[in-house]
A protein has these predicted regions:
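Signature of Gram-negative outer-membrane beta-barrel scaffolds
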Residues: 1-28
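Residues on the lipid-exposed face of transmembrane beta-strands in outer-membrane beta-barrel proteins
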Residues: 18-22, 65, 75-79, 90, ...
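Repeated loop/turn-to-beta-strand initiation elements of outer-membrane beta-barrel proteins
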Residues: 27-30, 83-86, 136-140, 177-182, ...
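Transmembrane beta-barrel strands of outer-membrane/channel proteins
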Residues: 32-36, 77, 88-94, 142-148, ...
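C-terminal beta-signal and adjacent terminal beta-strands/loops
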Residues: 212-276
Length: 276
């Protein structure tokens, strides 16, 4: 009845990986590894049915898409102590058949949006994760990453490159009267795509928690987030040979609230020890 909705697709892939780890001490090690990751397109990427949002705008999937294969080579360092846990990872990855969404204007002036295995991507990145017990009552956590990405497509005649990354930090403090205070914040750099980029973003928040009743079964939390700038503004830009599109939108991000959680039941764990 609707032949343009009928399609089938099978994927068969081999996924190799290898790693070598060397202990520098009882609490630290380095690791070199290679792995391949798969990104199989979902049904919305494959479905060829044409959806017309407006007379001049149509979108559809591509049933000929193949599995996107990402190859990655990494070098990581780990150290674990009573005060600090640290992981640092340097990585180079590449994709030769990346799935991308792209748009073009046809002879009738209609903008077509679909997908193809048209992108070659190279990415170099460095990431760090750290957990630091500053005192018995104070802890700090940091997660940060930075990368440079280069995207190219001969089929579409497009290329783009740039720096990206994100940052998240969290401070926890144990206060008198069984109160736990948490402050957190984060930042995300613009996301780079083949035909454009999105804007950056940031967020932050505070929370105050306290447990009640026997075995701390009930927890009450007061929280607030993004209270200095209630409205967050975002933007994204798409550039092709035939048109340029810039979108602006905003979201009400400010939040204040109270939450209550109650733990039911109990779990007792007995660990059997073996004496040598």
């Amino acid at each position: 009845r609707h032949p343009d909705r009928n399609f089938s697709k099978n994927f068969d892939d081999v996924v190799p990986s290898a790693a070598i780890s060397y202990g520098l001490s009882e609490m630290s090690n380095i690791r070199v590894g290679y792995n391949m990751r798969l990104n199989r397109p979902g049904i919305w990427f494959l479905n060829p049915f044409r959806i017309s949002a407006t007379p001049n705008d149509v979108s559809y999937g591509n049933p000929d898409l193949s599995t996107e294969k990402s190859h990655s080579i990494s070098l990581s360092y780990n150290i674990f102590t009573s005060k600090v846990n640290l992981n640092a990872d340097a990585r180079y990855s590449f994709v030769n058949n990346g799935v991308t969404g792209y748009s073009f204007v046809d002879e009738d002036g209609v903008r077509n949006s679909t997908y193809g295995n048209y992108v070659r991507t190279q990415r170099t990145s460095l990431s760090v994760w750290m957990s630091w017990n500053i005192t018995d009552k104070t802890s700090f956590m940091l997660s940060a990453s930075g990368s440079y990405v280069d995207l190219r497509s001969k089929e579409l005649g497009s290329s783009n490159s740039g720096f990206g990354g994100n940052l998240y930090a969290q401070l926890q403090q144990r206060l008198p009267w069984k109160l736990d205070f948490t402050a957190y914040g984060g930042y995300g750099a613009p996301y780079i795509s083949l035909q454009g980029r999105s804007g950056s973003y940031n967020f932050y928040g505070l929370s105050l928690n306290r447990s009640f009743l026997k075995e701390d079964r009930m927890e009450v939390s007061l929280f607030a987030s993004d209270f200095f700038s209630a409205w967050k503004k975002y933007s994204s830009t798409t550039v092709t040979d035939t048109y340029r599109q810039t979108s602006h939108y905003k979201d009400y991000a400010c939040r204040f609230g109270v939450s209550l959680s109650w733990r039911l039941g109990s779990m007792n764990v007995n660990v059997k020890r073996t004496e040598r």
